[in-house]
UniProtKB/Swiss-Prot annotation:
Produces ATP from ADP in the presence of a proton gradient across the membrane. The catalytic sites are hosted primarily by the beta subunits. It is a peripheral membrane protein. This is ATP synthase subunit beta. Belongs to the ATPase alpha/beta chains family. SMART domains: AAA (SM00382). ATP binds at G152, G153, A154, G155, V156, G157, K158, T159. Keywords: ATP synthesis, ATP-binding, Cell inner membrane, Cell membrane, CF(1), Hydrogen ion transport, Ion transport, Membrane, Nucleotide-binding, Translocase, Transport. Its main location: membrane. Its EC number is 7.1.2.2. The gene is atpD. It is found in: Cell inner membrane. It catalyses: ATP + H2O + 4 H(+)(in) = ADP + phosphate + 5 H(+)(out). It comes from Shewanella oneidensis (strain ATCC 700550 / JCM 31522 / CIP 106686 / LMG 19005 / NCIMB 14063 / MR-1).
Length: 463
């Protein structure tokens, strides 16, 4: 437990001098002691500058910090509470409670910097995880123990989609969930807490928040805090769900920290260590022979450009990608998932079965053909198309509308009750549209319904 003194403060970067024979290691947690508002502030060592000086990043606001303050080295990285005591609680990056409900009362703490499971320890499964959302279950099915990314620009519905997934999976799935709010709005964190409380699953969820107003060091580490809690549940042999909103803010916090530490930026101004930082986080989100972590991560796409280095680096780590499109959202079709851009490794006849694979493929083929015909329709109109193409367009428009669905979490905005559609009903519905069974039903009947039976009922009512 060596002590040092603050020698320089530049925003969130703090240099601390220690005796030459007791210099802290990289990632060690240091604590400011003494009077004033900064008492108890935690710093994380990022670099050793030589001469006993270490460069650190503050995990809280550095307002009121000054040179000469005493700093104590804890001798280990930041550690956070793990285990069942964290369930139903809201914590910050350090694992301290921020829900005003008393101490966590944990029996064990884990350090947030841990090695990823070795190749021998990892396990993979082809078991599907039903989400109850038609477009996802059909075109980009999730695997239990897999990694899923929700990609989308600003305001196309990433958080709403994630909330619906939590609502459908966390309630139906009796396991435990960990929610890491990384650099997102405090209001959304608040909404999530009450959503979980009202639906009675709060005692199965641990929540870790490092929101937009926090310093970059805090936002950079909060994903690791949430992951550490999930790892503990996995190592106890449980199946755990990890929700991260938003991975892009994790990257952005890394960019801020990198700039503060004086590193030369790389492509588009991102940190040179972008791929490595992403790998450190993503490689730990994995399933072992003991238990599984199924993760759903929201990924903000800057300026709707999927080739931006941040989303592009994330793509490589995922088993399924759900791409949200602004064009589809502008048509009023929600969830605004692009069925032609979204992918899943599970969409294989050996995994999902031949029928599911053929229906998904058929849907994508019809939509792709419709996309190609749109230019001809815009210039020459529908009358110039062949009968086959007219039928393709008609079915494609029905499929487009049938891919929409009312959400439980959006009931308060839309006024229509949310629908959970089983995979069996989803396949039956789309198979019927492709085969021409519902050619006589107007396309409006397919908009914002659950199963195909509701669409038929809606059409009969309109007659």
């Amino acid at each position: 437990m060596s002590t040092g003194t603050v020698v320089q403060v530049i925003g969130a970067v703090v240099d601390v001098e220690f005796p030459q024979d007791a210099v802290p290691q990289v990632y060690d947690a240091l604590k400011i002691t003494g009077e004033g508002s900064c008492n108890g502030l935690v710093l994380e060592v990022q670099q050793q500058l030589g001469g006993g000086v270490v460069r650190t990043i503050a995990m809280g606001t550095s307002d009121g910090l000054r040179r000469g303050l005493e700093v104590v080295n804890s001798g280990s990285p930041i550690s956070v509470p793990v285990g069942t005591a964290t369930l139903g609680r809201i914590m910050n990056v350090l694992g301290d409670p921020i829900d005003e409900a008393g101490a966590i009362g944990e029996e064990e703490r884990y350090v947030i910097h841990r090695a990823a499971p070795s190749y021998e320890e990892q396990s993979n499964t082809t078991e599907l995880l039903e989400t109850g959302i038609k477009v996802i279950d059909l075109v980009c099915p999730f695997a239990k123990g897999g990694k899923v990314g929700l990609f989308g620009g600003a305001g196309v519905g990433k958080t709403v989609n994630m909330m619906e997934l939590i609502n459908n999976i966390a309630k139906a799935h009796s396991g435990l969930s960990v929610f890491a709010g990384v650099g997102e709005r405090t209001r959304e964190g608040n909404d999530f807490y009450y959503e979980m409380k009202d639906s009675g699953v709060l005692d199965k969820v641990a929540m870790v928040y490092g929101q937009m107003n926090e310093p970059p060091g805090n936002r950079l580490r909060v994903a690791l805090t949430g992951l550490t809690m999930a790892e503990k549940f996995r190592d106890e042999g449980r199946d755990v769900l990890l929700f991260v909103d938003n991975i892009y803010r994790y990257t952005l916090a890394g960019t801020e920290v990198s700039a503060l530490l004086g590193r030369m930026p790389s492509a588009v101004g991102y940190q040179p260590t972008l791929a490595e930082e992403m790998g450190v986080l993503q490689e730990r989100i994995t399933s072992t022979k003991t238990g599984s972590i199924t993760s759903v991560q929201a990924v903000y796409v800057p300026a709707d450009d999927l080739t931006d280095p941040s989303p592009a680096t994330t793509f490589a780590h995922l088993d399924a990608t759900v791409v949200l499109s602004r064009q589809i959202a502008s048509l009023g079709i929600y969830p605004a998932v692009d069925p032609l851009d979204s992918t899943s490794r599970q969409l294989d006849p050996l995994v999902v079965g031949q029928e599911h694979y053929d229906v998904a493929n058929g849907v994508q083929t019809v939509l792709q053909r419709y996309k190609e015909l749109k230019d001809i329709i815009a210039i020459l109109g529908m009358d110039e198309l062949s009968d086959d193409d007219k039928m393709t367009v008609s079915r494609a428009r029905k499929i487009e509308r049938f891919l929409s669905q009312p959400f439980h979490v959006a009931e308060v905005f839309t006024g229509s009750p949310g629908k959970y559609v089983s995979l069996k009903d989803t396949i039956r519905g789309f198979k019927g549209i492709l085969s021409g069974e519902f050619d006589h039903i107007p396309e409006q009947a397919f908009y914002m319904v659950g199963s195909i039976d509701e669409a038929v009922e809606k059409a009969n009512k309109k007659k």
